[in-house]
């Protein structure tokens, strides 16, 4: 499989990177962290730039790109540690686009920024795919969803619930009666909430395996968020090793430091390739549960190790929050748990260990 990026994809990467460097300085992100908020102003500019529409069909107002292109965008956002729900809205929007009922009619609103939906999937069991919440005959939802990223800032929640014993997606106005959000303090300092629904009005937008598909996409993109955090840490660590002097020379000239940087680079590269391969499989229409789980397991296992190696090279200088390194350490560790930890993803692979695959 050829995973070399095309000229257009490299241009997309560079465009997103330059945009974020100009529009999302780290001091601005620090203030948002302190306020436990999200960057609504930056989100408006992101919508205007069309970055969100990369992986949506032209009929819905998108640019007709691939999921691989979306993954490149998500990685760049992770490399800047910005406080916007790019992954969450992309997953919810793609789920709406795939729905056979009312979902596709709402996608143009998502791409225009009028609708900011985020997935609400996890329940008390904290296991993806374990959906117990049921829609009432009156068309309302009563129950709780846990760890809803940006749940308190979204305009709508795309809630996974059961309808007649089958999983389906329901769109709930986050400001409607019966909806209350309980903000949580997260490891990565990104907004997350427990959302309580008390006879909240809900509109069915589709089913037919949409929940499982959303989990696969979210998991693959979360792997690239891990990669983005690791790459940012690697870049900063190499730059520091080349400028920090000890014993009359840059510490990057010492073999032990070089080994740390080399180990970081090899982990980042392998995790990125697995994640891009998983997205390519999803682009081809495969369910790709094993590929996606392998990508997320690798990224989730590598992230804490790579990020800690970065801190070892930085020494005490990497501990203070005036150093930007902490952005990526906290976000990377958080993303390593989001959408499936190492253990959860390995369990997915173990459940399918006897299935035939075409890539071994």
Per-region residue spans from a language model:
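A generic structural signal for well-ordered coil/turn residues at beta-strand boundaries
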Residues: 115, 129, 153-155, 166, ...
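A short core secondary-structure module
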Residues: 120, 144-178
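Flexible, small-/acidic-enriched active-site or ligand-binding loops
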Residues: 128-132, 147-149, 173-204
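Short beta-strand-to-turn element immediately C-terminal to the catalytic PLP-Schiff-base lysine
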Residues: 96-100, 159-162, 171-174, 196-199
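Alpha-helical interface subdomain recognition
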Residues: 1-80, 99, 113, 140, ...
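Cytochrome P450 C-terminal beta-domain/meander region
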Residues: 128-142, 286
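N-terminal glycine-rich flavin-associated loop
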Residues: 83-101
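A short, Trp-centered hydrophobic/proline-enriched beta-strand micro-motif
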Residues: 112-125
């Amino acid at each position: 499989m050829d995973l070399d990026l095309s000229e257009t994809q490299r241009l997309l990467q560079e465009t997103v990177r330059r945009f974020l460097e100009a529009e999302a300085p780290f001091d601005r992100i620090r203030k948002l962290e302190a306020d436990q908020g999200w960057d609504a102003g930056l989100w408006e500019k992101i919508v205007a730039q069309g970055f969100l529409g990369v992986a949506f069909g032209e009929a819905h107002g998108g640019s007709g790109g691939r999921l691989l292109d979306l993954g490149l965008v998500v990685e760049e956002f992770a490399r800047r540690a910005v406080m916007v729900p790019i992954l969450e809205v992309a997953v919810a929007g793609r789920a709406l686009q795939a729905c056979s009922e009312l979902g596709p009619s709402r996608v143009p609103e998502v791409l225009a920024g009028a609708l900011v939906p985020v997935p609400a999937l996890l329940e008390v069991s904290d296991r993806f795919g374990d959906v117990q919440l049921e829609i009432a005959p009156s068309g309302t939802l009563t129950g709780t969803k846990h760890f809803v990223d940006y749940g308190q800032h979204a305009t709508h929640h795309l809630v996974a619930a059961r309808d007649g014993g089958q999983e389906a997606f329901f769109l709930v106005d986050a400001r409607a009666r019966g909806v209350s959000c309980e903000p949580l303090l997260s490891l990565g300092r990104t907004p997350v909430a427990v959302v309580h629904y008390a006879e909240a009005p809900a509109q069915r937008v589709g089913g037919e395996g949409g929940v499982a598909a959303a989990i696969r996409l979210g998991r693959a993109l979360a792997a690239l968020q891990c990669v983005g955090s690791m790459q940012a840490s690697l870049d900063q660590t190499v730059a520091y090793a080349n400028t920090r002097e000890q014993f009359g020379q840059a510490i990057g000239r010492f073999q032990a430091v070089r080994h740390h940087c080399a180990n970081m680079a090899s982990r980042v590269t392998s995790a990125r390739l697995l994640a891009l391969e998983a997205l390519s499989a999803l682009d081809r229409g495969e369910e790709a549960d094993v590929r996606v789980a392998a990508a997320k397991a690798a990224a989730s296992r590598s992230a804490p190790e790579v990020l800690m190696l970065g801190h070892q090279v930085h020494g005490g200088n990497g501990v203070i929050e005036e150093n930007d390194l902490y952005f990526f350490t906290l976000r990377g560790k958080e993303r390593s748990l989001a959408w499936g930890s190492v253990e959860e993803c390995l369990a997915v692979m173990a459940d399918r260990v006897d299935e035939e695959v075409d890539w071994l």
